[in-house]
Regions:
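Surface-exposed extracellular loop regions of Gram-negative outer-membrane beta-barrel proteins
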Residues: 117-118, 360, 365, 421-423, ...
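A beta-strand signature from Gram-negative outer-membrane beta-barrel systems
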Residues: 121, 133-177, 733
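Transmembrane beta-barrel wall of Gram-negative outer-membrane proteins
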Residues: 217-363, 388-390, 606-609
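Signature of Gram-negative outer-membrane beta-barrel scaffolds
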Residues: 321, 357, 450, 454, ...
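Outer-membrane beta-barrel signature, preferentially recognizing the C-terminal barrel domain
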Residues: 374-395, 538-551, 599, 617, ...
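Gram-negative outer-membrane beta-barrel transporters
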Residues: 677, 682-687, 703-801, 878
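C-terminal beta-signal and adjacent terminal beta-strands/loops
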Residues: 742, 782, 793-802, 827-881
Length: 881
């Protein structure tokens, strides 16, 4: 991205944020003059000054620096996933498949709770659940808290996102919706496909044919088959002989959602209710671009780009260099909430949430690889990934009126059990190379073909209890809180790798290697003296198990110290233990030996926030807190994982420490109308032992790992405006302008960070200097129409921090996110006495590209990964019965 473009967009967002409050002030400050026809207006009366709280939205009522995302906000943006909707919030950015960055900090510094309970992640490489799993139809609101409160988990860095599922409504209904969309780089274009088999694979449900065959389950290590050729032959032939990738036209994206509620009013104020919702979505995306890896000095290791084919000496088959990937995504989600209320003071609620996503991937990379210098190589991968998260929570709320000054006691309790899983029942990789006679042949080395099976299971059990006591003491409002938490988490991962390799003494002919894999690995060529034998090439570090236990307690108080000054202070105590068991990888000293990581530590975490209402509808907040950031269980294991999106290997670090963070916040807030506000805030954070994702040598190439830097700081400014103006102010005599309103929602965040790591400094990994959002549109509640133009900007950020290896530091990998320009419109029609909501949306109007790159000491720059993002056109229809 050019500096001019960055500065221009940042200036646009900043000017919108700073000038809109002036317009609002002018509108507020211009009351109509009294007229003679209004006798009361010209009467002389005594001056009466009334001071009171005008609280137009929930954001002001909170005791913390926070933003609230409501159902109305989601309707304005037209977002289908909660991650997309959160990207519109001040200081938030969404990276990859729904991972939230708050104030430019990486997803590791973000916490997510659902109805008060933490959630496990179905991603082995991530510590938090991806928000693209959550359709907006299942979420009622989201509170984004940027200052820490003692009732929440102590792992807090950038912010906490508290999601709430839809509550039991006040009336019964049945709602249905459908959508269809097309993306310019994918829909109707040729995609890459392979036969997953099974009757339900077209909706993302695989049959047993993708699982590890029963024959191999007898002994997955194959060790007992070593002296039994017949058993070894049977094991090889039991694997599915599906390898090839074919081309076919991509379908458009589509989706359906259904929700309904039932209410039953019983006698004596007892009320039963239930809410259910289900959502299904299908999406297919093509990605075509370049991938490269570089040496420290900028020399090329792997070149997967069109330029690689130019170096093939004029061979006619040296075409199509670069990478191509097609991913089909099937999402099936369901929510059930059932509750009972007793006289409005007591409530029991059972909530069950199921989020399931399946991805079928086909990848072809063609170019120059360091494993075959000077030869064009074609690498292909078939991948099937099933992710699922299931959360079950039983909760209660009980209110008791007490005969004392603090006269209202509320008791909230919850018991939650959640599971997350990620299964890769079938992943195949194989390589061909273009040899000097212009023929592609399967590579002869041990890496010519591999078949993987892996499974990850994550269980989370949590019990929470909270007490809230409200009342008046000495004519001052006071709220006391206390509570506790017990959480247990277990994670298990297991993987198996297999490869067909030539039997002892067998040389595979060049002619056989020139055929497709289905012929090369046909049953006739497996076992005995035929050619290939199945080998187990599993690494000892492909297995790990981990546990974590947290016990916590907190107390806090919110007190009106003097008139217009509220102070909230508290402290949380957390005691935790993390245990990870794995093995030393092959190729390293002590390969196969067990290795354990144990982190046991306790913390006192103080927090305080002061809110001063120094003027009508204005207030100033100051906040301080101490928080922590633990390594994830995955990050403490040295097991190797493959990042399917970037095709990069990743390994944890058993020597990681817990990071400690000091947080300071100052924010001015002005509420000048219903759902209208302006804010300007300053923030500062200091880190001890911050955990950073690094780019470093792994095996024969480069990959990702984690390490503690020495210290880091982050400072920044954020501003926000939410402003609505009736259009008839501009043209009161034009009928079309009647009842129409123009709204502007804009925010901008500038932040600067510095990490001290060994002998050099840099920005925090994942932190963007500039973030900005702009929503400009109009709506007519009477005509039930609305249109919104949305802009989302995220500045460059370090994707992977380079580390010092020997006497040289590897260059950082820098990510350049696209500028996203979207247009959303909706209209409600009445047909046959029923309302129908019709929506249209255009996403990524600019057709931006995605890029990650490295800059070298000699002034050169290399693209690590780059591809074009298409423009998406969507239509939706929904109705309620």
């Amino acid at each position: 991205m050019t500096p001019t473009r960055t500065i221009g967009l940042a200036g646009l967002l900043a000017s919108t944020v700073l000038t809109a409050p002036a317009l609002a002030w002018a509108q507020d400050a211009a009351p109509s003059a009294p007229t003679p026809q209004d006798p009361e207006a010209v009467s002389t009366v005594e001056d009466i000054v009334v001071r009171g709280r005008f609280v137009p939205d929930v954001k002001r009522e909170t005791s913390a620096v926070a933003n609230i995302l409501t159902e109305e906000d989601i309707k304005r943006s037209g977002d289908s996933e909660i991650g997309e909707a959160l990207a519109r919030v001040t200081g938030l950015s969404i990276v990859g498949d729904g991972y939230v960055y708050v104030r430019g900090l990486g997803d590791r510094y973000s916490s997510i709770v659902l109805d008060g309970s933490t959630l496990p992640s179905p991603e082995p490489l991530k510590r938090v659940v991806p928000l693209d799993l959550f359709p907006t139809s299942l979420v009622s609101n989201a509170q984004i808290q940027k200052t820490y409160s003692a009732q929440y988990p102590g792992e807090f860095g950038g912010g906490l996102i508290a999601l709430s599922t839809r509550a039991i409504p006040n009336e019964r209904f049945l709602s249905f919706g459908a959508s269809i969309s097309a993306e310019t780089e994918s829909t109707g274009k040729e995609g890459l496909y392979w036969d997953a088999g099974g009757k339900l694979s077209n909706i993302g449900i695989a049959d047993n044919s993708l699982n590890l065959p029963n024959f191999i389950k007898i002994d997955p290590s194959l060790k007992s088959f070593a002296n039994n050729p017949a058993m070894l032959q049977g094991a090889g032939r039991s694997l599915r002989n599906i390898w090839s990738i074919d081309g076919d036209k991509n379908l458009p994206d589509f989706g359906f959602n259904l929700s309904g509620a039932e209410i039953i009013d019983l006698s004596n104020g007892i009320r039963l209710g239930g809410f259910v919702a289900a959502d299904y979505d299908y999406q297919v995306r093509n990605r075509e671009g370049v991938r490269n890896s570089f040496e420290v000095n900028g020399g090329v290791n792997d070149q997967i780009s069109p330029g690689a084919c130019d170096s093939a000496g004029g061979l006619s088959n040296a075409t199509g260099c670069g990478f191509q990937r097609t991913e089909q995504e099937y999402a099936l989600n369901a929510l059930g909430a059932f509750g009972i209320e007793f006289n409005e003071n007591h409530e029991l609620k059972l909530t069950t949430l199921l989020l399931r996503k399946t991805r079928q991937q086909a990848l072809i990379e063609r170019g120059l690889f360091s494993a075959d210098p000077g030869l064009i190589r074609s690498f292909q991968r078939l991948n099937w990934i099933e992710q699922q998260m299931n959360s079950n929570q039983l909760s209660g709320r009980h209110v008791f009126m007490l005969p004392m000054a603090l006269d209202r006691l509320q008791v909230d309790w919850r018991a939650a059990y959640s599971t997350a899983s990620r299964d890769t029942p079938y992943r195949r990789e194989y390589s061909y190379r273009l040899e000097p006679d212009n023929v592609f042949r399967m590579t002869p080395g041990s890496d010519s073909n591999r078949t993987f099976f892996s499974a990850l299971e994550d269980e989370n059990t949590e019990f929470g209890l909270d007490f809230t006591l409200n009342g008046m003491i000495a004519d001052r409002e006071i709220t006391l809180k206390a509570g506790g938490l017990h959480q247990e988490r277990e994670r298990d991962f297991a993987s198996r790798r297999y490869s067909f390799q030539p039997a002892a003494g067998v040389i595979i002919s060049p002619e056989l290697r020139s055929f497709v894999p289905e012929i090369i690995f046909s049953p006739d060529n497996i076992g005995g003296d035929a050619g290939y034998t199945l080998r187990d090439i599993t690494d000892p570090s492909d297995f790990f198990d981990a546990t974590m236990e947290i016990n916590a307690a907190y107390v806090s108080a919110e007190v009106e110290v003097i008139r217009d000054l509220r102070v909230t202070a508290g402290v949380r105590y957390e005691d935790s233990e993390q245990q990870v068991n794995s093995f030393i990888p092959l190729g390293e000293t002590g390969a196969g030996d067990p290795i354990a990581a144990n982190l046991a530590q306790d913390f006192w975490l103080p927090t305080a926030t002061a809110t001063w209402e120094f003027a009508d509808n204005m207030q100033l907040r100051f906040g301080y807190s101490k928080t922590i950031n633990r390594p994830d269980l995955r990050e403490l294991s040295n097991a190797l994982f493959l990042d399917d999106d970037s095709n990069t290997l990743e390994r944890g670090n058993p020597n990681l420490k817990i990071a400690e963070i000091q947080n300071y916040d100052l924010r001015w807030e002005w509420y000048f109308g219903q759902r209208q506000s302006a804010t300007i805030g300053l923030f500062y954070k200091s880190f001890d032992n911050p955990i950073e994702r690094t780019y470093q040598p792994i095996g024969e190439g480069f990959g990702r790992s984690f390490q503690n830097a020495q210290e880091a700081t982050l400072k920044g400014v954020e501003a926000e405006i939410d402003y609505t103006l009736p259009m008839d102010v501009w043209a009161p005599n034009l009928t079309w302008f009647q009842d129409n309103e123009v709204f502007v929602v804009a925010n901008v965040t500038w932040s600067d960070s510095e990490v001290t790591d060994a002998a050099y400094t840099r920005a925090l990994q994942g932190q963007s200097e500039w973030l900005g959002n702009l929503q400009f549109g109009f709506e007519n509640p009477t005509a039930r129409r609305r249109a919104t133009l949305l802009v989302n900007y995220q500045g460059e950020r370090i994707s992977d921090a380079g580390i010092i290896t020997g006497s040289t530091r590897l260059p950082d990998v820098v990510e350049t996110p696209p500028i996203l320009l979207d247009l959303v419109a909706s209209q409600t029609f009445t047909v046959g006495g029923r309302d129908y909501d019709v929506g249209a949306k255009i996403e990524n109007i600019l057709g931006e590209e995605y890029e990650r790159s490295q800059s070298f000491a000699n002034g050169g720059k290399g693209v690590v990964e780059g591809y074009k993002l298409g423009t998406t056109f969507s239509l939706s229809l929904s109705t309620t019965f």
